[in-house]
Amino acid sequence: MKNIAENITYSSEKANVFQLKKSDKLKYFAVALGKNGVLKKHTAPVPSTLVVLKGEIHFVMENEQLHFRQFDVYEIPVGVEHEVTGISDENLFTVAQEL
């Protein structure tokens, strides 16, 4: 058994990523951000689903800024550059990638 809360820290300096599961078909991980913490620009090379478990985040891609709250679910567009910023003091989301 894995406990996410015991394996992450909320930092405004950098994203904290904790791998939950990896197989030849799935990569599943949790990302923790403190207030104003940033998951720097990157792309999702495969279909990916984001689920916010705690806090609020800004999800910025191209010229669009989205705001997600606890329990929001979002299908991340494949190949589109995006960046995520924490709004609350503690922000936690998971990403499931179909490999």
Predicted segments with their positions:
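A short, N-terminal "cap"/entry segment at the start of jelly-roll beta-barrel domains
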Residues: 1-25, 60
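A generic beta-sheet turn/junction motif
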Residues: 24, 45, 61, 86-88
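Short, charged/polar surface micro-motifs in flexible loops or helix N-caps
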Residues: 25-26, 35-36, 56, 99
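Conserved short histidine dyad/triad with adjacent acidic residue
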Residues: 27-44, 78
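Short, surface-exposed secondary-structure edge patches
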Residues: 30, 49, 64-67
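Short, conserved beta-strand element in jelly-roll/cupin
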Residues: 32-34, 45-58
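Short acidic-glycine-tyrosine-enriched beta hairpin
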Residues: 63-78
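Ligand-binding loop in jelly-roll beta-barrel domains
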Residues: 78-99
